[in-house]
Amino acid sequence: MAKKSKALRAAIEKIDATKAYSVEEAVALAKETSFAKFDATVEVAYNLNIDVKKSDQQIRGAMVLPNGTGKTARVLVFAKGAKAEEATAAGADFVGSDELVAKINGGWLDFDVVIATPDMMAVVGRLGRVLGPRNLMPNPKTGTVTMDVTKAVGESKAGKVNYRADKAGNVHVPIGKVSFDTEKLVENFKALNTVIAAAKPAASKGAYITNLSVTTTMGPGVKVDSASF
């Protein structure tokens, strides 16, 4: 632990805490100050001036990053008949119905994304207590409740990320790995920022993005100037 603390202190010393960096500078600095011994995830953190208690100010959705996330998602699809065959052909890792419900209720969770056709939601609903807390419950807003399973599976495999504001208006989204070229991370970051900016509720007054930073797994946060996009 002492070694990690020393590494973190050294990383923090490279960052000017009083400065908001341009997106390019911030991403490069986040990569430079990453000290994890594995290919750390690069994550963007927003604090938004919204009141999530109001239904018209909730921020939630999904998008496909232009350069992916660096992680191949394990996709599970609840579907039957022709749609099950379509999901398998699209590259889904697991496809089924009640047998998957039983397996998941038994403790199996070796998947990253859950997709369902609308007619299967009554079956999937039985997994609410398991999937809900893990943000794995299929939802129309994120494109995971759909009849177009080919598109849903393809997007999930291509680097689709979900975003959702918590009770304090914070949104955390991974944009890639430290091993990515800085340019690719910046491109992902800018694509994400375009989506988040466009999601501003009409009822949100004043500054919308009140704080923005980029960080890596275990690494320090680097403040980003939202006007640099």
Swiss-Prot record:
Keyword rRNA-binding assigned: yes
UniProt GO cellular component terms: large ribosomal subunit
GO terms of molecular function: rRNA binding; structural constituent of ribosome; tRNA binding
Keywords per UniProt: Repressor, Ribonucleoprotein, Ribosomal protein, RNA-binding, rRNA-binding, Translation regulation, tRNA-binding
Keyword Ribonucleoprotein applies: yes
Pfam families in the cross-refs: Ribosomal_L1
Biological process according to GO: regulation of translation; translation
Function: Binds directly to 23S rRNA. The L1 stalk is quite mobile in the ribosome, and is involved in E site tRNA release. Protein L1 is also a translational repressor protein, it controls the translation of the L11 operon by binding to its mRNA.
Family statement drawn from the similarity comment of this UniProt entry: Belongs to the universal ribosomal protein uL1 family.
Quaternary state and interactors: Part of the 50S ribosomal subunit.
Protein name: Large ribosomal subunit protein uL1
Organism, scientific name: Lactococcus lactis subsp. cremoris (strain MG1363)
Protein's gene: rplA
